[in-house]
């Protein structure tokens, strides 16, 4: 495919390579939003929003594949969808499975998928699914972290287990403040440290990016770890604040470990045509 540029203003002749840009069509083009890529035995697998999956052996030629999550998401997620994110403003599960990330768990000997199930007004939940093969079927394990809760519905989450009496009798107003910890439980990014610890970052916009420790035996939250309440730094439920907040953009956190350093990548702006979407 060839693209050309033109102008109504008088111009001088430009070299051909300045006026024509070649854009060869990508072979096997497959559109996947919020992609997470993982390699196993020489094959690369991509998982994305709305349960899109593809694989490749050369990172150029891709083919889609199906599993029970793509074919029948309600069979895996119907229970948690009805219990938390589903609302009149947001009635369909199919369009609300967002931004999965997949990691191998050495202790469980399973592939672990952390998937966001999105709801209206931040009433979302990140759940864990496991599989023996990346191109196989998935098993639902349970919720990892909730958002969008208040005093009226907090009993339907694991917040009371984490906060204890505070969830029933304490002040939960910080979880309703866009300048504090009113985050959206989406965009999970699990990481494995060199010494075997598992952590997961998550969050989006407004309240910033947070992370807490996972239990490698279950793949879920490590309930034995407690976090203090320190404004702008730590929260008993959401763990440790990593970045962002103050009603600013910032989502899709991702970590890369190189030469003893951890590097955090985040998306800024918004995804509209004029949103200035960028990764820093």
Language-model features, listed with the residues they occupy:
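Carbohydrate-active catalytic/glycan-binding domains of CAZyme proteins
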Residues: 1-280
């Amino acid at each position: 495919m060839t693209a050309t540029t033109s102008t109504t203003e008088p111009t001088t002749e430009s070299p051909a390579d300045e006026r024509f840009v070649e854009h060869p069509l990508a072979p096997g083009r497959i559109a996947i939003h919020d992609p997470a890529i993982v390699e196993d035995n020489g094959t690369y697998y991509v998982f994305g929003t709305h349960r899109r999956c593809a694989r490749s052996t050369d990172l150029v030629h891709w083919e889609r594949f199906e599993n029970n999550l793509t074919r029948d998401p309600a069979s895996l997620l119907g229970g948690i969808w009805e219990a938390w994110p589903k609302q009149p403003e947001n009635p369909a599960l199919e369009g609300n499975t967002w931004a999965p990330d997949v990691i191998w768990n050495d202790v469980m000997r399973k592939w672990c998928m952390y998937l966001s199930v999105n709801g209206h007004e931040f009433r979302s939940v990140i759940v864990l699914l496991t599989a023996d093969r990346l191109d196989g079927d998935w098993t639902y394990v349970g919720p990892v972290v909730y958002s969008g809760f208040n005093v009226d519905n907090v009993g339907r989450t694991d917040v009371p287990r984490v906060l204890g009496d505070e969830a029933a009798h304490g002040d939960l107003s910080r979880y309703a403040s866009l300048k504090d910890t009113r985050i959206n439980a989406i965009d999970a990014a699990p990481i494995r440290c060199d010494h075997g610890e598992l952590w997961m970052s998550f969050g989006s916009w407004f309240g910033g990016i947070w992370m807490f420790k996972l239990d490698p035996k279950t793949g879920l939250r490590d309930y034995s770890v407690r976090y203090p309440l320190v404004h702008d730094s730590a929260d008993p439920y959401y763990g440790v604040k990593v970045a962002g907040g103050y009603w600013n953009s910032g989502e899709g956190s991702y970590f890369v470990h190189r030469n003893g350093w951890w590097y955090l990548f985040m998306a800024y702006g918004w995804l509209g045509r004029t949103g200035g979407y960028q990764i820093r």
